[in-house]
A protein has these predicted regions:
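Rhodanese-like catalytic fold shared by cysteine-dependent sulfurtransferases
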Residues: 1-20, 27-57, 66-103
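Short, surface-exposed ligand- or partner-binding patches at beta-edge/loop junctions that are enriched
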Residues: 61-62
């Protein structure tokens, strides 16, 4: 079973800081809105396992959660410690949301 976290729980993880937060959406979507400290690795550019640390947990998110679940399953099968944000960025309403409107 794949580990998931709620959008509300994500703030706690961000404050802890001991993970990589990966946004799987396009560069354009990332520029419009993303979660602070996220690394943008669009799905098409993500070579499973390439350039990803295996010694710290990964938290993945996408627009609604389905894409991040699929990618997380493949990464978990390769031995990565990975979680996904249920509902993706659409569900996130925490204080770390960065958008073009609030820059």
């Amino acid at each position: 079973m794949l580990d998931t976290i709620s959008a509300k729980e994500l703030d706690w993880y961000i404050e802890d800081g001991s993970f990589w937060l990966i946004d799987l959406r396009s560069e354009e979507e990332f520029r419009e809105m993303h979660i602070r400290n996220a690394v943008n690795i669009p799905r098409g550019e993500l070579q499973l396992g390439q350039h990803l640390p295996q010694n710290i947990p990964l938290i993945l998110y996408c627009e609604r959660g389905a894409l991040s679940m699929a990618v997380a399953r493949r990464l978990a099968a390769k031995g990565y410690r990975v979680k996904t944000v249920v509902g993706g960025i659409r569900a996130y309403r925490g204080r770390y949301l960065v958008s073009e409107k609030n820059r």
